[in-house]
Design a protein with these regions (language model features):
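Hydrophobic residue at the +6 position relative to the catalytic HRD Asp in the kinase catalytic loop
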Residues: 103-105
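C-terminal active-site "lid" helix and adjoining low-complexity regulatory extension at the edge
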Residues: 79-80, 94-98, 107-157
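Phosphate-binding site of ATP-dependent enzymes
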Residues: 1-96
Length: 157
């Protein structure tokens, strides 16, 4: 229990087909989606290179985040979610006032319903994007950031 006597109760939901889906949103628009395949006994669902710990100590000083030979990531594949799921992810991001990031969901094995369980205000773009999703999302991200940086600031006094 927290100092204010609040508590968070979590329930484990088994993911149908042993996978979760991450939808990336950029500027309120669908960028791409991937399915992350779950490994038995693991909970690390991050598709980026730097997220998966190994049994051996690692030095990240010499590790490139775009190294295609790394084993420090969960197995992923491109995915095309239904339009309604994409719209749900867009609405979640808009309601959260997040312009760049991802929404993760799973289909529950027991009831077949989708559960949105993670909202990320920072994109962990998939490693090897051209191979996985067919394009490199970083130029789109850079263009978006530059366009936002060039917008005049609204100052309220």
């Amino acid at each position: 229990m927290g100092m204010d006597q609040s508590a968070i109760l979590q329930e484990y939901l088994e993911a149908k087909d042993n996978r979760i889906i991450r939808i990336e949103i950029l500027g309120g628009e669908f960028l791409y989606a991937i399915q992350v395949f779950l490994s038995s006994g693991e909970f690390n669902l991050c598709p980026a290179d730097y997220c998966k710990p190994s049994d051996e100590p690692q030095s990240f000083n010499n590790t490139r985040l775009d190294d295609p030979n790394t084993t420090n990531r969960a197995p992923v594949a491109s995915f095309n979610p239904p339009d309604q799921i994409i719209e749900n992810a867009r609405r979640i991001m808009t309601a959260s006032n997040i312009e760049v990031g991802g929404v993760e969901y799973l289909i529950n094995e027991s009831d077949g319903l989708e559960y949105y369980y993670d909202i990320n205000a920072l994109s962990n773009f998939v490693a090897n994007p051209i191979e996985i999703v067919g394009f490199d999302p970083f130029p789109s991200l850079v263009d978006f950031v530059v366009s936002r940086a060039n917008e005049p600031l609204a100052v309220t006094l």
